[in-house]
């Protein structure tokens, strides 16, 4: 039997999604909790391996099991054995041809910047703070150069293990909601650090240090050393994974919890 789960987590105190020796990970905590409910070991496969400090409101995973439990048990029972910063939002049975990663058509991320001279005391680790005034309209305009299928070598981490830097960006929207600037980006997939590297360079445009056309120039140069530093992990959320309709994967509010924009 194959089961898919929707997962939400605060990534602040984890080394990232992927299980690693000697450090705490979201995958490890989830597998340990599921193993209690299954009374046997469980291995999960995720849609997107988030980095250390990165959050998710729409992570999707799957696992195989021979144990027959009500879906409610896989959800509520697992939650009873998880730390408070990880939660299973839903559980459904899926067909054998479903794979959380390889069946996905697209992933969607949001990056949240608190753009105020003073830092926030309420959400210090759920947002990225930038104290210089940013022009979100210029950031949005610059981001449109990244739409479509392109070589994202300029926005790719040096240690990226992907075989190709080519990705197809479906949309990139930068909007302001009072002191919050939200970057919303969807693509078929992302190279390592792609969203945070894009944000870092768009901040240069928003601050006025670089022209809008600089982003187009960076894309064409295909050279990571020419782009801005990587933006902090704290502001990044995996908010949605899109699948073919035949799998009937539940659609949840995109989040993060303090922001429910369209």
From Swiss-Prot:
Residues engaged in binding substrate: 109
Instruction: Return the protein name.
Output: tRNA pseudouridine synthase A
What are the UniProt keywords, alphabetically?
A: Isomerase, tRNA processing
Q: What InterPro entries is this protein classified in?
A: PsdUridine_synth_cat_dom_sf (IPR020103), PsdUridine_synth_TruA (IPR001406), PsdUridine_synth_TruA_a/b_dom (IPR020097), PsdUridine_synth_TruA_C (IPR020095), TruA/RsuA/RluB/E/F_N (IPR020094)
GO molecular function ontology, one term from the record: RNA binding
UniProt entry tagged with the keyword tRNA processing: yes
- The active site annotation covers 51
């Amino acid at each position: 039997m194959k089961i898919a789960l929707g997962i939400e987590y605060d990534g602040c105190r984890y080394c990232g999604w992927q299980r690693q020796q000697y450090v705490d990970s979201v995958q490890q905590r989830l597998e340990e909790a599921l193993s209690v409910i299954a009374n046997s070991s469980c291995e999960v496969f995720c849609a997107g391996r988030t980095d250390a400090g990165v959050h998710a409101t729409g992570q999707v995973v799957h696992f195989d099991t021979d144990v027959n439990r009500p879906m409610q048990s896989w959800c509520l029972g697992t939650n009873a054995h998880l730390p408070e910063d990880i939660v299973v939002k839903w559980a459904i049975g899926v067909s054998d041809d479903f794979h959380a990663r390889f069946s996905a058509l697209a992933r969607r991320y949001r990056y949240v910047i608190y753009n105020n001279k003073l830092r926030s005391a309420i959400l210090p680790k759920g947002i990225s703070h930038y104290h210089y005034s940013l022009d979100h309209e210029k950031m949005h305009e610059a981001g449109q150069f990244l739409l479509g299928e392109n070589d994202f070598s300029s926005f790719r981490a040096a240690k990226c293990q992907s075989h190709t830097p080519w990705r197809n960006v479906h949309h990139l929207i930068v909007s302001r909601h009072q002191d919050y600037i939200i970057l919303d980006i969807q693509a078929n997939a992302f190279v390592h650090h792609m969203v945070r590297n894009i944000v870092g360079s768009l901040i240069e445009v928003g601050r006025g240090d670089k022209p809008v056309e600089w982003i187009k120039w960076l894309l064409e140069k295909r050279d990571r050393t020419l782009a801005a530093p990587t933006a902090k992990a704290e502001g990044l959320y995996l908010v949605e994974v899109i699948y073919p309709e035949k799998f009937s994967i539940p659609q949840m509010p995109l989040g993060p919890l303090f922001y429910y924009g369209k």
